Swiss-Prot record:
It comes from the Bacteria. This is UPF0150 protein TM_1311. SUPFAM superfamilies: TTHA1013/TTHA0281-like. The lineage of its organism: Bacteria, Thermotogati, Thermotogota, Thermotogae, Thermotogales. Belongs to the UPF0150 family. It comes from Thermotoga maritima (strain ATCC 43589 / DSM 3109 / JCM 10099 / NBRC 100826 / MSB8).
């Protein structure tokens, strides 16, 4: 099995508090109450998803939508 070098996760703030993270390329979703907890949960989710061929790097990007009145 070919090893992926990296996966990009997109994080958003949860309506219930904390963060939700997902990746579009794989069916991997996770969440955490704090940013630090989220990063640990991402590592755990990636390890659980891949039996072998896990990526060497994970990029976590935080996206925040803001509406500004002009």
């Amino acid at each position: 099995m070919e090893t992926q070098k990296e996966i990009v996760f997109i994080a958003v703030e949860s309506e219930d508090g904390g963060y939700i993270e997902k990746t579009e390329r794989y069916s991997i979703f996770t969440q955490g109450d704090t940013w630090e907890e989220l990063l640990e949960m991402i590592k755990d989710a990636v390890k659980c998803h891949f039996d072998e061929g896990a990526p060497k790097y994970v990029h976590a990007r935080f996206v925040k939508d803001v509406t500004i009145a002009v």
